[in-house]
């Protein structure tokens, strides 16, 4: 293989390896009422030397359990006290880019889902043909995109089970969130 420097301007075939990392932007807990949407606002100013990081995306992971309660004599019937799942929806927003994902909780271990927004050219990773080194770099170097304000919107739509003589109550859910910037930390280019 040729050295990268000797072929930086020529088009050709490349093996491109990229190592991704993450940088925590925010985390916390919020109680979200049924039908409510809360917005969590964040900014990369909270990260030291953020301008030196190649930010290529953002990921939010939400974790939640079921807290539906039931009461009444009818709850002794088989299945009457089983909760109905709630739908937890998250929208990750950066500039004009956004993505929405939903998940449902269950009566058991905590459930979770993630939502990601990315702005790098994933076709420039792996075996890449007929491009120059500078085209690869342009596709994978964010050039400062990723700095600034972010928002995570979380909403809950509860489902309540129940049966005759068994009343269910579910006003919302406790939602834990973790927001991470996706970083491209290292790039290896081999001209083939």
Which role does the model predict for each range below?
Residues 55-57, 130-165:
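Noncatalytic modules at the cell exterior or secretory-pathway interfaces
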Residues 34-119:
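Acidic, Ser/Thr/Pro-rich low-complexity intrinsically disordered segments
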Residues 150, 158-186:
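Edge beta-strands of jelly-roll/beta-sandwich modules across compartments, strongly enriched
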Residues 1-28:
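N-terminal leader/pro-regions and domain N-caps
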Residues 62-68, 94-96, 156-162, 181-185:
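Beta-strand elements of well-folded, non-transmembrane domains
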Residues 33, 51-53, 143-147, 172:
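Surface-exposed coil/turn segments at beta-strand junctions on protein surfaces, enriched
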Residues 22-29, 98-147:
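Extended, solvent-exposed segments with strong compositional bias
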Residues 190-192:
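Conserved small/polar residues in nucleotide/adenosyl-binding loops
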């Amino acid at each position: 293989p040729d050295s990268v420097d000797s072929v930086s301007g020529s088009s050709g075939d490349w093996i491109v390896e990229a190592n991704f990392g993450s940088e925590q932007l925010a985390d916390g807990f919020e109680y979200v009422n049924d039908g409510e949407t809360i917005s969590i606002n964040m900014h990369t100013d909270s990260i030291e030397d953020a301008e030196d990081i190649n930010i290529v995306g953002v990921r939010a992971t939400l974790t939640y359990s079921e807290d539906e309660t039931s009461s009444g004599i009818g709850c002794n019937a088989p299945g009457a006290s089983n909760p109905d799942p709630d739908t937890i929806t998250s929208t990750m927003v950066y500039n004009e880019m956004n993505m929405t994902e939903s998940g449902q909780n269950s009566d058991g271990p905590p459930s979770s889902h993630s939502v990601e927004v990315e702005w790098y050219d994933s076709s420039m990773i792996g075996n890449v043909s007929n491009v120059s080194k500078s085209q690869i770099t342009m596709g994978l170097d964010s050039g400062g995109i990723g700095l600034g304000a972010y928002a995570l919107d979380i909403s809950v739509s509860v489902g309540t089970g129940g049966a005759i003589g068994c009343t269910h109550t579910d006003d919302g859910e406790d939602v834990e969130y973790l927001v991470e910037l996706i970083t491209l930390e290292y790039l290896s280019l081999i001209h083939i």
